[in-house]
A protein has these predicted regions:
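Glycine-rich phosphate-binding loop plus the immediately following alpha-helix
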Residues: 116, 122-163, 168
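Alpha-helical scaffold segments in soluble metabolic enzymes
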Residues: 42-45, 49, 71, 90-93, ...
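Short glycine/serine/threonine-biased micro-segments
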Residues: 6, 10, 64-66, 103-104, ...
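N-terminal glycine/serine-rich phosphate-binding loop of ATP-dependent small-molecule kinases
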Residues: 1-83
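Structural motif
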Residues: 5-7, 25-26, 60-62, 78-79, ...
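Short glycine/serine/threonine-rich phosphate/pyrophosphate-binding segments
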Residues: 15-18, 106-112, 136
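Short, acidic/turn-prone active-site loops that include or flank metal/cofactor-
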Residues: 32-38, 84-90, 129-133
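Conserved phosphate-binding catalytic cores of ATP/NTP-utilizing and phosphoryl-transfer enzymes
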Residues: 1-2, 68-115, 119
């Protein structure tokens, strides 16, 4: 039996990601599911599945982020957190020495520069791609699928390339 927990959910353009953590900040459950355009249904299914293992009335707080995070937060009574802030805080929690965060999302790519002042996280700067989605995760996912590779294997192959192409920018 599990005690109290905190819930975080990222509803993106390609996937829904969920994490449940105990009050000490230890990850109890982590899930990544491609939603195939069914963002709301996928998110609710994940919450229902989580409820089978963790009583949802034991949830101390729920925070939502990403493209579909605001609507879900409003409908479920949770908090909405801007994804740049969520990524910076999450990275700082698990890897406080990190100063550069690169997020390759389904619709955009972000570069987030973070620092620390007086023992607190500071977002120093961030930038997003201004070009088409060719340099983002959904494009890479589509190309992997076209070539018959799972995206996880596709990225491993890319790291072995001796002449990587410039995709966008």
């Amino acid at each position: 039996m599990h005690g109290k927990f905190d819930l975080g959910m990222d509803i993106g353009s390609v996937s829904v990601n969920l994490v449940a953590m105990n009050p000490r900040g230890e990850v109890l459950r982590e899930v990544y599911v491609r939603h195939l355009g069914e963002t709301y249904r996928t998110a609710l299914n994940l919450l229902e599945s989580l409820g089978e293992e963790f009583p949802l009335d034991s949830c101390r707080l729920a925070a939502f982020t990403g493209l579909g995070g605001k609507a879900l937060a409003e409908s479920l009574g949770g908090a909405f957190v801007n994804e740049v802030i969520a990524q910076a805080r999450g990275t700082y929690h698990f890897q406080p020495q990190v100063r550069t965060i690169i997020d390759m999302g389904g619709e955009d790519a972000k570069l987030i520069l973070v620092g620390e002042e007086a023992g607190h996280l500071v977002i120093q700067d961030f930038a997003m791609n201004t070009m088409c989605a060719a340099g983002t995760g959904s494009f890479l996912d589509q190309q992997a699928n076209r070539l018959g590779y799972p995206i996880e294997e596709f990225s491993e192959l890319a790291l072995k390339s001796t002449t990587p192409p410039r995709i966008a920018g």
